[in-house]
């Protein structure tokens, strides 16, 4: 059963542009550091803080 309401207009859906052809800047490819490398860097800066982080995250 198709309902047609004269007060409701039908929107025409245009084909979405290809994501590769967007006019804006592209998102940089940035990989997040793993938890192990994060802990190593934290130990270099502040050993006590890295221990607290280990306890909070359960590592």
Swiss-Prot record:
Positions carrying Deamidated glutamine: 59
InterPro entries cross-referenced by the UniProt entry: UBact
GO MF annotation terms: protein tag activity
Cross-link (Isoglutamyl lysine isopeptide (Gln-Lys) (interchain with K-? in acceptor proteins)) at residue(s): 59
UniProtKB keywords: Isopeptide bond, Ubl conjugation pathway
PTM comment, free text: May be modified by deamidation of its C-terminal glutamine to glutamate by the adjacently encoded deamidase. This could be a prerequisite to the subsequent conjugation, as shown in the other prokaryotic ubiquitin-like protein Pup.
Region (Disordered) location: 1-59
Family the UniProt entry places it in: Belongs to the ubiquitin-like protein UBact family.
NCBIfam families for the chain: ubiq_like_UBact
Its job: May function as a protein modifier covalently attached to lysine residues of substrate proteins. This may serve to target the modified proteins for degradation by proteasomes.
Protein name stated in the entry: Prokaryotic ubiquitin-like protein UBact
Gene source species: Nitrospina gracilis (strain 3/211)
GN (gene name): ubact
């Amino acid at each position: 059963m198709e309902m047609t309401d004269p007060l409701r207009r039908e929107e025409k859906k245009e084909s979405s542009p290809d994501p590769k052809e967007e006019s804006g800047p592209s998102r940089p490819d940035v990989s997040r550091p793993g938890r192990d490398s994060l802990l190593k860097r934290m130990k270099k800066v502040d050993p006590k803080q890295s221990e607290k982080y280990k306890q909070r995250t359960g590592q």
